[in-house]
Amino acid sequence: MAATDIARQVGEGCRTVPLAGHVGFDSLPDQLVNKSVSQGFCFNILCVGETGLGKSTLMDTLFNTKFEGEPATHTQPGVQLQSNTYDLQESNVRLKLTIVSTVGFGDQINKEDSYKPIVEFIDAQFEAYLQEELKIRRVLHTYHDSRIHVCLYFIAPTGHSLKSLDLVTMKKLDSKVNIIPIIAKADAISKSELTKFKIKITSELVSNGVQIYQFPTDDESVAEINGTMNAHLPFAVIGSTEELKIGNKMMRARQYPWGTVQVENEAHCDFVKLREMLIRVNMEDLREQTHTRHYELYRRCKLEEMGFKDTDPDSKPFSLQETYEAKRNEFLGELQKKEEEMRQMFVQRVKEKEAELKEAEKELHEKFDRLKKLHQDEKKKLEDKKKSLDDEVNAFKQRKTAAELLQSQGSQAGGSQTLKRDKEKKNNPWLCTE
């Protein structure tokens, strides 16, 4: 189709309509480029690998700068993810680069759950983006996208095979992120061992079903180079920020007693291949794959968990509005059911409480009757005792009165006899001599 042609949808097909002159929509690519350049780009790299494999050094070498960061130790109690964001600019293109490092990965005795913090971190970035998408007022053009676009998995240069930790971790990550395996510190093993090691790694990845990122070959402009580079995976890399004079040029290299290893010499390592594939050729594809494949998978699973689906049980198309109405009706039904259950529960509890109160009231009445009867019995006993005491008091008073009366009568009789005797003595003097 010519550049000045236009395709218009008509029914199920379309027809090509020639233009009589220049319209101007051929500038759309330029408009898109200008808009993208003005907004800037973001790229997020996750570096996974054991401590001491040169992850930070390789990042410095890849972007030809010195990133500030604290060196990790082997004494971490668990795996921690450390994220640092940098603003870079090359020509008029701005890049917001985020580098996430797995501090303490592989340093623990028990490495069984070492992959979990990494998976949780990746999911957390997906969740943050999903929540931003679900907002009523979205501002995705200003939102800092923190989703991981590529995972550089650093493999220790043992020269034998992949560790179980590496296989398990990559298997857990392959459905969530684009994985590019790389052999770190490739100058630690010989060239023949390195070739065998690459073959062994590829074989183990295939046999264990680990899906690593394949450079796309559907674009004719990069199909050939990407197809060639896919055959070189995993890349064997060396990192160095030190510049040495080799011949008449200053080159990044490592100096050893036996010679010099040049970082950007493809005969020495695959650093240049990695940089070309990661940054110059496939950076945008990595960003696109993250959004269209990994994020969409996470989003679909999350929406399905929430009850949203594209089809009904009969595999018929199901619109979002229908899904919403179905979920709303389902929710209202559940709400009514819960309300009815709560009402029944409330009524049951009221009945139980009423029964308890009636039983308590009955017990109180019985207790009151017992106490009342006991009170009456005690009152009767006290009244009987009081009556008895009153009778005793009255009898005592009567006896006292009689005794006083007898005493007074005795006193009067004794006085009369004394007067009579005195009178007789007076009349009869002989009685005095007696």
Swiss-Prot record:
Composition-biased stretches, type Low complexity, lie in 407-417
Q: What does this protein do?
A: Filament-forming cytoskeletal GTPase. Required for normal organization of the actin cytoskeleton. Involved in cytokinesis. May play a role in HCV RNA replication. Forms a filamentous structure with SEPTIN12, SEPTIN6, SEPTIN2 and probably SEPTIN4 at the sperm annulus which is required for the structural integrity and motility of the sperm tail during postmeiotic differentiation.
**Keyword terms of this UniProt record:** Acetylation, Cell cycle, Cell division, Cell projection, Centromere, Chromosome, Cilium, Coiled coil, Cytoplasm, Cytoskeleton, Differentiation, Flagellum, GTP-binding, Host-virus interaction, Kinetochore, Nucleotide-binding, Phosphoprotein, Spermatogenesis
Name one matching Pfam family.
Septin
Region G4 motif, as annotated, extends over 184-187
**Where are the Phosphothreonine modifications?**
T418
- Whom does it interact with, and what assembly results? Septins polymerize into heterooligomeric protein complexes that form filaments, and associate with cellular membranes, actin filaments and microtubules. GTPase activity is required for filament formation. Filaments are assembled from asymmetrical heterotrimers, composed of SEPTIN2, SEPTIN6 and SEPTIN7 that associate head-to-head to form a hexameric unit. Within the trimer, directly interacts with SEPTIN2 and SEPTIN7. Also interacts with SEPTIN9 and SEPTIN12. Interaction with SEPTIN12 alters filament structure. (Microbial infection) Interacts with HCV NS5B.
Renumbered residue ranges of the record's region G3 motif: 101-104
Record PANTHER family: SEPTIN (PTHR18884)
Q: Where in the cell does this protein reside?
A: Cytoplasm; Cytoplasm, Cytoskeleton, Spindle; Chromosome, Centromere, Kinetochore; Cleavage furrow
Provide the species name: Homo sapiens
Protein family? Belongs to the TRAFAC class TrmE-Era-EngA-EngB-Septin-like GTPase superfamily. Septin GTPase family.
Where in this protein does the record say N-acetylalanine is found? A2
Q: Where is this region: Disordered?
A: 405-434
> What PROSITE patterns does the record point to?
G_SEPTIN (PS51719)
Tissue specificity comment: Widely expressed.
- Chief place where the protein resides: cytoplasm
Q: Which residues carry this modification: N6-acetyllysine?
A: K367
State what protein this is by name. Answer: Septin-6
Q: Alphabetically, which GO biological process terms does the record hold?
A: cell differentiation; cytoskeleton-dependent cytokinesis; mitotic cytokinesis; protein localization; spermatogenesis
User: Coiled coil: which residue ranges?
Assistant: 321-409
Q: Give me the segments passing through the membrane.
A: none
Protein residues bound to GTP: 49-56, 104, 185-193, 239, 254
- Kindly give any further remark recorded in the entry: Coordinated expression with SEPTIN2 and SEPTIN7.
| One GO CC annotation | midbody
Q: Outline the segment boundaries, as ranges, of region: G1 motif.
A: 49-56
